[in-house]
């Protein structure tokens, strides 16, 4: 019997989001990816997070189909699948086809959550590494209107955003008929996002955290979480790992968290966060940790805009 992961309702929708999700971004993809997804389901994971820009959509879909065939889950309704609109499709006329392509790749009829991956657009022909001349401003009103249509058509149960600041959410909400159900952003003890969390709470937007351990191994990740002395001391005192303390801290802030590991032992450890808690004193110590934003998104800077500086990308939230 796997771990029962708590869930939280998303706004006024009928969907509830599991408060711990399984991240699938990896370059190159782990050879044992599909087997690890099946193992994750056995452990109790039900929320799987992917994106059009990740190489994991197709193998994730294959693994989910296998899980259903094996009876590891009784029905598609037991799963919560998130994917994200890529920047080359962040235009009027490309959003719905972009989601339809994602659904075909995953082999699914609908998503539970579809996110705008980042508030910027790239020309449809753009490839990595991003060239400054390929960057375009994000059409808040036009793209979001098509995201709303995706939900109305039943292609996704809910819609949301990722990497949006308070200012960018304010701009989106000014014209949105359906407000974003979720804002998925970087958050961990080293980057606590207090201002943005308060804003999302005030607006009824569920806050979801990626990179709870600092995204070690990515091109922008860091080891500041795993090497932090405050977290190490708390972990030692509690007989837990630093990773467990960091994930528990995020969970204890009342937000959902996307964890990622293909190591079977750590996959299990990442779920061992529900039957213990951090004390008020420990929370206070963590709150005083010096802050550092890992994901700065410098790839989207251009002398011609829309973002000329990192400060402009994050509206000073750095």
From Swiss-Prot:
Protein's UniProt keywords contain Oxidoreductase: yes
Cross-referenced CDD domains: AKR_AKR4A_4B
Pathway: Secondary metabolite biosynthesis; terpenoid biosynthesis
Protein keywords: Oxidoreductase
GO molecular function list: oxidoreductase activity, acting on the CH-OH group of donors, NAD or NADP as acceptor
Tissue expression summary: Expressed in flowers, maturing fruits and in juice vesicles.
Coiled-coil stretches: none
UniProt catalytic activity: (1S)-1,7-diacetoxy-luvungin A + AH2 + H2O = (1R,2R,3S,8R,10R,11R,15S,16S)-3-(acetyloxy)-15-[(4R)-4-[(2S)-3,3-dimethyloxiran-2-yl]-1,4-dihydroxybutan-2-yl]-2,7,7,11,16-pentamethyl-5-oxo-6-oxatetracyclo[9.7.0.0(2,8).0(12,16)]octadec-12-en-10-yl acetate + acetate + A + H(+)
EC number: 1.1.1.-
Broad enzyme group: oxidoreductase
Positions of the catalytic residues: 54 (proton donor)
Functional note: Aldo-keto reductase involved in the biosynthesis of limonoids triterpene natural products such as limonin, a compound with insecticidal activity responsible for the bitter taste in citrus. Can use (1S)-1,7-diacetoxy-luvungin A as substrate.
PANTHER family assigned to the protein according to its UniProt record, in alphabetical order: ALDO/KETO REDUCTASE
Family note: Belongs to the aldo/keto reductase family.
Name the record gives this protein: (1S)-1,7-diacetoxy-luvungin A aldo-keto reductase
Origin species: Citrus sinensis
């Amino acid at each position: 019997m796997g771990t029962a992961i708590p869930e939280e309702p998303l706004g006024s929708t009928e969907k509830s989001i599991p408060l711990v999700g399984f991240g699938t971004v990896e370059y190159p993809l782990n050879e044992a990816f599909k087997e690890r997804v099946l193992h994750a389901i056995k452990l109790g994971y039900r929320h799987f997070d992917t994106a059009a820009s990740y190489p994991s959509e197709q193998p994730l879909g294959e693994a989910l189909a296998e899980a259903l065939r094996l009876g590891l889950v009784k029905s598609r309704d037991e799963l919560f699948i998130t994917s994200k609109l890529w920047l080359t499709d962040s235009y009027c006329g490309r959003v719905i086809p972009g989601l339809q392509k994602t659904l075909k790749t995953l082999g699914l009829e609908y998503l539970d959550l579809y996110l705008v991956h980042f508030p910027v657009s790239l020309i449809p022909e753009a490839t990595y590494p991003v060239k400054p001349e390929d960057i375009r401003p994000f059409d808040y009103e036009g793209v979001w209107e098509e995201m709303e249509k995706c939900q109305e058509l039943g292609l996704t149960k809910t819609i949301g955003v990722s990497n949006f600041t308070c200012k960018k959410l304010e701009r989106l909400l000014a014209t949105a008929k359906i407000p974003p159900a979720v804002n998925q952003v970087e958050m961990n003890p080293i980057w606590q996002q207090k201002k943005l969390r308060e804003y999302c709470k005030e607006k009824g937007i569920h806050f979801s955290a990626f990179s709870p351990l600092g995204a070690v191994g990515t091109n922008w990740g860091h080891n500041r979480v795993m090497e932090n002395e405050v977290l190490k001391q708390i972990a030692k005192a509690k007989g837990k790992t630093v990773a467990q303390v960091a994930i528990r801290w995020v969970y204890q802030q009342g937000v959902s968290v996307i964890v990622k590991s293909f190591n079977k032992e750590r996959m299990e450890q990442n779920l061992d966060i529900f039957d213990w808690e951090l004390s008020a004193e420990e929370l206070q110590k963590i709150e005083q940790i010096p802050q550092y934003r890992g994901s700065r998104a410098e790839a989207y800077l251009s002398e011609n805009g829309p973002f000329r500086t990192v400060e402009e990308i994050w509206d000073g939230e750095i």
